[in-house]
Amino acid sequence: MNKYFTCYVVASLFLSGCTVQHNLINETPSQIVQGHNQVIHQYFDEKNTSGVLVIQTDKKINLYGNALSRANTEYVPASTFKMLNALIGLENQKTDINEIFKWKGEKRSFTAWEKDMTLGEAMKLSAVPVYQELARRIGLDLMQKEVKRIGFGNAEIGQQVDNFWLVGPLKVTPIQEVEFVSQLAHTQLPFSEKVQANVKNMLLLEESNGYKIFGKTGWAMDIKPQVGWLTGWVEQPDGKIVAFALNMEMRSEMPASIRNELLMKSLKQLNII
């Protein structure tokens, strides 16, 4: 099976701080470097959690945090898969950016989800039911074909089309996530430019002082230990793209904002924003 992106990292990377090369099908290999930033290590320690922040600039990938081995460990993508779900759905004309997904009055996990919304609004609210509906429209066969075509993570979706990204079997490493989102940021994924532009517009989180921050959160609550994500990119004032994937162990009592707090502090520490 051809993968659009795959990576191989030797264990010594996390022990010695050396650099290695990993292969991207149809791409120039990226250089992976263990970052040396004790302050970011301490940020994760202070939150009593284990985590890694993967940063990609051009073809160089740097790893920061207090659990760098997580960078090449597979985890369920949780709601970060909404990015690919939207790309597949729009590309295959299963929806469009103007469609209103109707709420039928059923109880949902969060009251913020209990309303009609577009795909873009559902992306910002991380409304699982809307993206489950989209996945069902796409269907198991087409979804499997598309996930394999893109080579996202292990590309395994199992037999249930509306929860494989929440509980498995789909899994992806933080390095693979940062590669995926970097290609999206540069409009280099094998989808139409229009579809990629539409999805990128859904992901804008913040804009200030000439910087734009795009991203998607994820929180896998139904697995043990729980996993948190925040994956996206910074568009700097000069147009340069810096992609990131934050991955950490979560606990039920943690505030959802902890991921954004860790990310923003780390990006400032690295002078990315």
UniProtKB/Swiss-Prot annotation:
Enzyme class: hydrolase
Residues holding a beta-lactam: 79, 82, 126, 217, 219, 259
Gene3D superfamilies, per database record: DD-peptidase/beta-lactamase superfamily
Signal peptide: 1-17
Similarity comment: Belongs to the class-D beta-lactamase family.
NCBIfam families: bla_class_D_main, blaOXA-23_like
Name of the protein this chain belongs to: Beta-lactamase OXA-23
Source organism of this protein record: Acinetobacter baumannii
